[in-house]
Amino acid sequence: MKRTNKNIFLSSGALFFLIMPIGSIGHDIVFFVVCCSYSLFTFYVLSDTTSFKVKMAKSLIPLIYPVAFHVPIHIIFSDAQVSILSTASYFLAVGFGILIYCTKNRLRIVPIAAFTAITIFFATKGYDLWLHKVNYGTYLGGVEEAITNIELPNANGEKIVLTGYNDEIIVLDFWTTSCGYCFQKFPVFDQVRKKYTSNSRIKFYAVNIPISRDKSGDALQIARELPYGFSHLFSPTEAIARQFNVNSYPTVILVKNGRILYRGDVGGVSSSINKLTEEELKKMNL
């Protein structure tokens, strides 16, 4: 196919719209596919026999579609942060495609290796870190924030203090009745709890945050039907979630001595608990 501006524009458009549905599977997969396909496509465009300036101009044509479709979404909708990296992958792929093409043959292995490493990292661990940042405000979960004295009722109406004084470790799993993913993560939260049953100073609670469609007693009824060993607490308003800076569900919070020390996914809280218990053992052995 002759590499005219029109053909490049149409071909890159077809490639763009073929990739777009992959976003429903995962933006990490989009990142990988875009990096592979767009870098190769850019290299192919540059392999034409036209002058260098014309080649450079043609290599930027594939960016018309992501600029026209994705960039405005990120400008208008703050919730689109989750897909920023997959959008950036178009520019990364074209940039490295140009760099690889312009590098002399013997040195080409350097940008190829760098691009491969970046692609693999962000298509795997890097995207997980970014999602953690978007959902919880931190890349790895570690925070250190003071929290005021907070009490919430349990299923029996008894008030439970959540500030973790006297070296107690309080682990909270925030959920709502409409959050299907919260229910999927409950078994994982319970498995974490089981690991620390021998330590009476580590407490695990699932904290329900009410939503507008909840009827009185809905959350309590659901909690009583769940087959897990952790206790349930019930917030009367969303204000509690704001006090803990919870912006998405589920969110797991670890509190000790009036300070939030972890905010993130349930999968990362065990390392924070282990770190705290190890520090306590060291103090005891001094």
Model-derived features with residue positions:
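Alpha-helical transmembrane segments
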Residues: 3-20, 59-68
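Juxtamembrane "helix-exit" motif on the non-cytosolic side of transmembrane helices
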Residues: 17-28, 68-81, 127-132
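Membrane-embedded alpha-helical segments of integral membrane proteins
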Residues: 56-101
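Internal/C-terminal transmembrane anchor helices
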Residues: 106-132
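N-terminal "domain-start" segment that seeds a small globular fold
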Residues: 128-162
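Short active-site neighborhood of thiol/selenol oxidoreductases, capturing the structured segment around
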Residues: 160-184, 189
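Structural microenvironment flanking redox-active thiols in thiol-disulfide oxidoreductases
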Residues: 184-225, 236-243
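Thiol/disulfide oxidoreductase modules built on the thioredoxin-like
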Residues: 224-229, 236-284
